[in-house]
């Protein structure tokens, strides 16, 4: 259904909906929740909240109000329920966002997330389309959370690598979002989540009418992610992502399979993927690297070629 005030809907597979309420203010609406990917309930709450809040940052906005979405089995201890909610609350406070209530239902397994409302100026909305030939793509978080959380279940990675992936997933995109909003000539932005870098890059490329080439050798990776991927520890979601983009992807002879696997890896609370001219990307990178030293240029956009995506 069309509405003149609906500035961003579901037609471009964007990260959130945006609705204009005045000439100065537009409301960003998004919702996200999932089952636990970690055993610690407080950490689960933090990660789920950071993941939900990320969509607002990807749209160029700031989150302001949220509602809890919680599904719990009867057997889940009350202390665990409390810890999940406290973890989510802690991230909301860090984001400057008020949790004003929510809804809880009984379910066979726990699920948690947020419905988030944010604000943005109608003229400063960032979308996942609009990349232009000559733009480079900047990624603000390393890849590998899907591979590593799969490896954790089999106790295959070191405690240090485990703690690092937990920290990455629980980190808000707030600082990165602030840096991106301050950057010049940002043409497109999205966050890298369940469809992996390949899937979200394809959505950006196809919606923008460009070809995006990703460079495997420049991808920032979480500690031990490459080792695990080379061992064949690849989550099922990565294969689904590869099937999704395969008709639209040219894999060049220089590509290494391990980097292709990690580009398809589904991310939880992943980083922002930003398209902007190279001359504007350099100062953005300098700002990002003051708090996210792994931030990197991972590809570039060009005039459309045979496929929307290329990987070398």
Q: Could you describe each region identified by the protein language model?
A:
Residues 1-312:
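Helix-biased detector of long, well-ordered alpha-helical tracts
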């Amino acid at each position: 259904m069309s509405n003149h005030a609906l500035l961003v809907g579901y037609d471009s597979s964007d990260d959130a909906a945006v609705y204009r309420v005045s000439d100065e203010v537009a409301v960003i609406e998004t919702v996200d929740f999932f089952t636990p990917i970690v055993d610690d309930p407080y950490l689960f709450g933090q990660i789920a909240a950071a993941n939900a809040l990320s969509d607002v940052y990807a749209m160029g906005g700031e989150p302001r109000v949220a509602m809890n979405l919680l599904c719990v089995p009867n057997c889940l201890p009350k202390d665990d329920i409390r810890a999940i909610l406290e973890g989510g609350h802690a991230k909301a406070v860090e984001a400057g966002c008020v949790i004003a209530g929510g809804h809880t239902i009984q379910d066979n397994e726990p699920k948690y997330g947020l419905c988030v409302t944010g604000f943005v100026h109608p003229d400063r909305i960032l979308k996942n389309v609009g990349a232009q030939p000559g733009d480079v793509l900047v990624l603000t978080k390393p890849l590998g959370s899907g591979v590593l959380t799969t490896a954790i279940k089999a106790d295959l990675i070191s405690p240090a690598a485990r703690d690092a992936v937990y920290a990455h997933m629980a980190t808000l995109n707030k600082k990165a979002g602030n840096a991106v909003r301050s950057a010049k000539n940002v043409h497109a932005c999205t966050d890298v989540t369940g469809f992996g870098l390949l899937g979200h890059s394809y959505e950006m490329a196809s919606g923008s009418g460009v070809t995006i080439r990703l460079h495997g050798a420049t991808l920032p990776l979480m500690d031990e992610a490459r080792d695990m991927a080379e061992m064949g520890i690849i989550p099922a979601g990565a294969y689904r992502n590869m099937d999704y983009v395969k008709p639209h992807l040219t894999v060049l002879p220089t590509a290494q399979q391990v980097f292709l696997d990690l580009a398809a890896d589904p991310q939880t609370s992943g980083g922002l993927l930003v398209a902007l001219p190279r001359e504007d990307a350099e100062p953005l990178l300098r700002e990002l690297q003051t708090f996210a030293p792994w931030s990197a240029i991972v590809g570039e956009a060009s005039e459309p070629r045979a496929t929307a995506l290329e990987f070398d």
